[in-house]
């Protein structure tokens, strides 16, 4: 049987897990739970704007661990891919404004498009925004999603695929986010983490 959690000093709570709460309610609730960190989903900062949301977060004393989510790079047309890149640059700016050192990337996929094509578009998209992320002092983290999301959410479904993208990018600005919900099944999970 698992031990009861008694030390929350390293606990970070994601605002999506308390979705009905506003950012202010989440901040108050997390502090009451003695959590020290917060990961913010973009929809929770939208009602305030990044500047005001950043002030709320700074005033709270919580450590902003990351901003979710960027990504969604694949598209069937070049104009749509460039629009996604520009949106990711705005997301990086939001992360900087709220004090998040990291943007989690849900990389995207296009239904009916071969996943290899989508992965190449993901690679190209991340590569295009890395200079902006570096300038902003914000890191990017590829989050592989469970294969059930491969059709329209992410063509990156294993940690190996994410690590291969990172290797190809060759940038210290890019890493991975390992979510047990999405990767528990991966037979190479432990070796890919190492």
Give short role names for the model-derived ranges.
Residues 2-23:
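Boundary/entry segment of secreted carbohydrate-active catalytic domains
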Residues 24, 31, 38, 67, ...:
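Acidic/histidine-rich catalytic cores of soluble enzymes
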Residues 2-5, 54-56, 95, 131-132, ...:
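Short secondary-structure boundary/capping segments
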Residues 7-11, 29-36:
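A short, Lys/Arg-enriched amphipathic alpha-helix followed by its capping loop at the start of a domain
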Residues 36-124, 134-135, 139:
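Structural motif corresponding to the early beta-alpha repeats
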Residues 17-19, 42-44, 70-73, 107-111, ...:
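Active-site-proximal loop/turn and secondary-structure-junction residues that shape catalytic pockets
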Residues 6-8, 59, 135, 171:
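Short, well-ordered coil/turn elements that cap or connect secondary structure elements
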Residues 18-30, 49-53, 82-93, 186-193:
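Short, acidic/polar
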């Amino acid at each position: 049987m698992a031990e009861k959690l008694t030390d929350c000093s390293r606990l970070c709570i994601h605002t999506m897990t308390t979705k009905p709460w506003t950012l202010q309610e989440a901040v108050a609730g997390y502090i009451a739970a003695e959590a020290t960190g917060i990961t913010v989903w973009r929809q929770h900062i939208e009602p305030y704007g990044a500047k005001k949301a950043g002030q709320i977060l700074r005033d709270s004393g919580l450590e902003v661990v990351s901003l979710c989510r960027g990504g969604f790079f694949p598209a069937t047309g070049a104009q749509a891919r460039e629009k996604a890149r520009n949106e990711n640059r705005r997301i990086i700016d939001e992360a900087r404004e709220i004090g998040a050192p990291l943007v989690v990337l849900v990389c995207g996929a296009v239904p009916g498009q071969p996943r290899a094509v989508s992965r190449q578009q993901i690679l190209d998209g991340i590569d295009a925004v890395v200079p902006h992320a570096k300038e902003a002092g914000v890191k990017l983290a590829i989050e592989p999603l469970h294969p059930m999301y491969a059709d329209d959410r992410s063509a990156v479904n294993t940690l190996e695929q994410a690590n291969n993208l990172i290797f190809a990018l060759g940038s210290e600005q890019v890493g991975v986010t390992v979510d047990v919900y999405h990767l528990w099944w991966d037979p190479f999970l432990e070796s890919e983490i190492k």
